Amino acid sequence: PCAPTGLVLKEFRVTLHCGDYRFDPSLPVYLWVDPGYAGAYAVEVAQVKNDTIYIIDEVYEQGLTTEEVILVCETKEWWSKVIGGAIDIAGRQHQGMPSTEEIWKLKGRIILNSQSISVVDGIDRFRTFLKPDPITGRPHFFTNYNCRGLIAEMGGGVNPIQGLGMWRYKTDRTGAIFSEMPDDKNNHACKAAIYGLVDRFGLAGGRSAKATIQKFY
């Protein structure tokens, strides 16, 4: 079947990228985080094997604080194997109280890295992992079937949070895309994945994200 019109990550296919990819106790765990309250708070739980990413679980909730999300994470079987991760650079903002990044450090005892990433650069990096390897025919990014928020944002299913859907580009009445900047909605899990991919692998083409100026929204 054809991908929905205007889908940002049109390379994603449930039949190619989804499977029974469960927690491997022999590997460390990384948390890739996009904080949110009114939309969604996304925590993508990643393990890396031979430069291939496996999203083994996610916490995808609406209306929870960072402290509450940490409590949810602490109940998971993979929690004791978490060694770090990445978060939206906006997680550094204080606004008169501890930043989101600091709360993860204080309450969860986890250090999450953050850096400025442009929207287009972030999408390009994600696509390099979704595209099948020209030699093996397999991509370098897989997700467990239970990661419904991430799968839905990429166009592979119904979003578990009512009112949220797929991450799309702006299109005109004919369905033609008219901007390389997608809508800043329905992208919480995808942005979390981008923060993690760039933190671990840099930008596509071997560039460093630290040289970019534009924040990812």
Where are these predicted regions, by residue range?
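Short, acidic Gly/Pro/Ser/Thr-rich loop/turn segments
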Residues: A38-A40, G202
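Short, flexible loop/turn elements at secondary-structure junctions
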Residues: P35-Y37, I89
